[in-house]
């Protein structure tokens, strides 16, 4: 008898599954007999419990298990016979109105994968960012590296680096050590008092009123000031309230940036301290980083372009599955940050609805494009990417071994190669406009993506 597949919508389908009761009962009896060999009941030795008593206690459970197994097996058989590309998990429900004495009947409702229509790639528009690394970018990087290695010296102390000038008052950029006491309506509050508290003026770590009060003070001086906490301040007990603070400055230290010399170059890993080599290595690293960032931007551009020219209906079941996947990823992220009970965090799946739909839709489009154009990752491509990635580490061979020792890591690299193949394929057919951008703009664009 041919299976009738009902069309309930664009992607939703339904089939009826019929299971002969004698076949089901035969399997139930076989499982109960097997179960009886190990069942323990008071008053009976193991394996000696009467079969009738075992059936009375376990028949309902065993019947449910058998029906579940048989329904799943039959649905798999039907889906293969009818060439159904089932998306997600089907739902099964008893077909009450057609129950027969000789058979169980169930409705299986499910979705199928959609037909994916990808438009003319020649109509896709992609803006490709390019950047040139010159002396200005190298100098900016050196400035950042110098600031990361800053040393502080107390204002007024003598020594190799002087005293930072005649003015010993706290200035922007100085590191200050303070004691402070805060009260609201004359009462101290939690977190409002501290001793030997250290921060750098001008970094924005403290509220503006606090930084303003510390500016211009010299060691041993105090200042009183009012501070209104923002309404959205993280400390709910004081949010929106005004506190009266007294801050006492104990120490002022001025920043001393290291000179760009051989010692500085050695601190960056240039063994002989050669400044030309140092600049060349910085340039190489910046070019590698620029390449990575431009690839990321152009990949997103290509993916957006593919979505614009593609037509398909997205299975709800796949969206719901991906929403749950994103919820679990969010919980794992919270756990890594040390949030208590993160695995049970009440994160609503609905907040990921749009993101999940885009991810699923893009996955279907990419799968169709890869299949239609033979863009699968080749072993030599995967190895080339692993080797390229390993170059930035001290022991490239160990990094390569690390990748090839774990199938999941290798699968992630394979997915990256497939995406790269897709990007190259689309760029070869789309309308591509090259745009020169600065390294700073490039870094900003990828940070916001």
Curated annotation (Swiss-Prot):
Alphabetical list of InterPro entries matching this protein: PPIase_dom_sf, PPIase_FKBP_dom, Trig_fac, Trigger_fac_C, Trigger_fac_C_sf, Trigger_fac_ribosome-bd_bac, Trigger_fac_ribosome-bd_sf, Trigger_fact/SurA_dom_sf
GO molecular function: peptidyl-prolyl cis-trans isomerase activity; protein folding chaperone; ribosome binding
PROSITE patterns documented for this protein: FKBP_PPIASE
Major enzyme class: isomerase
Sorted UniProt keywords: Cell cycle, Cell division, Chaperone, Cytoplasm, Isomerase, Rotamase
Location(s) in or outside the cell: Cytoplasm
Cellular component GO terms, alphabetical: cytoplasm
UniProt EC number: 5.2.1.8
GO biological process: 'de novo' cotranslational protein folding; cell division; chaperone-mediated protein folding; protein transport; protein unfolding
Catalysed reactions, as listed in the record: [protein]-peptidylproline (omega=180) = [protein]-peptidylproline (omega=0)
Function: Involved in protein export. Acts as a chaperone by maintaining the newly synthesized protein in an open conformation. Functions as a peptidyl-prolyl cis-trans isomerase.
Domain characteristics, as noted in the entry: Consists of 3 domains; the N-terminus binds the ribosome, the middle domain has PPIase activity, while the C-terminus has intrinsic chaperone activity on its own.
Protein name: Trigger factor
Source organism: Burkholderia mallei (strain ATCC 23344)
Encoding gene, per UniProt annotation: tig
């Amino acid at each position: 008898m041919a299976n009738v597949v009902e069309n309930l919508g664009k992607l939703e389908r339904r089939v009826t599954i019929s299971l002969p009761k004698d076949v089901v009962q035969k399997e139930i009896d076989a499982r109960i007999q097997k179960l009886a060999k190990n069942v323990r009941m008071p008053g009976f030795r193991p394996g000696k419990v009467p079969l009738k008593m075992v059936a009375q206690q376990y028949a309902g459970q065993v019947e449910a298990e058998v029906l579940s197994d048989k329904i799943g097996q039959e649905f798999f058989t039907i889906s293969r016979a009818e060439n159904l590309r089932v998306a997600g998990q089907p739902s099964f429900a008893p077909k009450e109105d057609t129950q027969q004495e000789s058979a169980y009947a169930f409705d299986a409702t499910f979705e199928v994968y959609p037909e994916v229509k990808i438009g003319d790639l020649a109509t896709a528009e992609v803006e490709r960012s390019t950047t040139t690394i010159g002396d200005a970018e190298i100098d900016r990087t050196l400035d950042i590296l110098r600031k990361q290695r800053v040393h502080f010296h107390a204002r007024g102390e003598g020594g190799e680096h002087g005293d930072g000038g005649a003015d010993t008052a706290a200035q922007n950029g100085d590191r200050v050590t303070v004691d402070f006491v805060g009260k609201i309506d004359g009462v101290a509050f939690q977190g409002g008092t501290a001793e030997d508290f250290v921060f750098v003026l001008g970094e924005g770590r403290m509220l503006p009123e606090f930084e303003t009060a510390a500016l211009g003070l010299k060691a041993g001086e105090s200042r009183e000031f009012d501070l209104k906490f923002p309404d959205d301040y993280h400390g709910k007990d004081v949010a929106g309230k005004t506190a009266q603070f007294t801050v006492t400055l104990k120490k002022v230290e001025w920043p001393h940036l290291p000179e760009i010399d051989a010692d500085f170059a050695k601190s960056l890993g240039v063994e002989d301290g050669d400044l030309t080599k140092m600049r060349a290595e910085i340039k190489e690293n910046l070019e590698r980083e620029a390449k990575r960032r431009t690839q990321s931007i152009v990949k997103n551009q290509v993916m957006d372009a593919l979505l614009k020219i593609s037509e398909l209906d997205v299975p709800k079941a796949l969206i719901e599955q991906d929403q749950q996947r994103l919820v679990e990823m969010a919980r794992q992220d919270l756990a890594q940050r040390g949030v208590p009970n993160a695995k049970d965090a009440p994160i609503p799946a609905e907040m990921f609805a749009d993101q999940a739909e885009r991810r699923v839709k893009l996955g279907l489009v990419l799968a169709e494009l890869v299949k239609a154009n033979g863009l699968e990752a080749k072993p030599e491509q995967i190895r080339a990417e692993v080797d390229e990635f390993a170059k930035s580490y001290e022991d490239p061979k160990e990094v390569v071994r690390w990748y090839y020792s774990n199938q999941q890591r290798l699968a992630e690299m394979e997915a990256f190669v497939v995406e790269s193949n897709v990007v190259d394929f689309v760029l070869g057919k789309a309308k591509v406009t090259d745009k020169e951008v600065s390294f700073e703009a490039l870094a900003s664009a990828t940070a916001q993506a």
